[in-house]
């Protein structure tokens, strides 16, 4: 599409998003926003697509932009709250994964250190082989 009409790009973004074609929807919303950076619904809908892709931080930025343009735009406030909740949960999940993996990594580090120490004592610093 070579349209210079922001509403055409916005409509295309909506159609692509409805069809589940998130990447093309993002491209269309970006084109709409290039042509009209104050298109509140385009910012909001771009945020929705990013949310679906679990790109919560980017979605929050889009909702913030929509709210900056129109502080009374309730959809953006609602969507931002959901994105922030899910972003927070993803951080909690990552922290739990890190906490689970930390002891494994510490044990591996200790084992590698012990091996390195034994090789050093035998004088085989580079290859780790017995001399």
Task: Show the residue positions of the predicted features.
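Alpha-helical segment of the N-proximal tetratricopeptide repeat
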Residues: 4-35
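Conserved alpha-helical positions within TPR/SEL1-like repeat arrays
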Residues: 7-18, 41-52, 75-89
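Canonical positions in the second alpha-helix
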Residues: 32, 65-66, 116, 123
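Short coil/turn linking the two alpha-helices of tandem helical-hairpin repeats
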Residues: 88-96
């Amino acid at each position: 599409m070579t349209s210079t009409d922001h509403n055409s790009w916005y409509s295309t973004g909506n159609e692509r998003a409805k069809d589940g074609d998130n990447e093309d929807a993002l491209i269309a919303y970006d084109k709409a926003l290039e042509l009209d950076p104050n298109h509140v619904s385009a910012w909001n809908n771009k945020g929705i697509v990013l949310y679906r892709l679990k790109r919560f931080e980017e979605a929050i930025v889009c909702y913030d932009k929509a709210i900056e343009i129109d502080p009374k735009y309730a959809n953006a406030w609602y969507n931002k709250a959901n994105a922030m909740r899910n972003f927070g949960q993803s951080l909690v999940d990552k922290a739990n994964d890190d906490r689970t993996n930390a002891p494994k990594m510490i044990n591996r580090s200790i084992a590698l250190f012990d091996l390195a120490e034994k090789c050093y004592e035998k004088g085989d610093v580079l290859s780790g082989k017995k001399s």
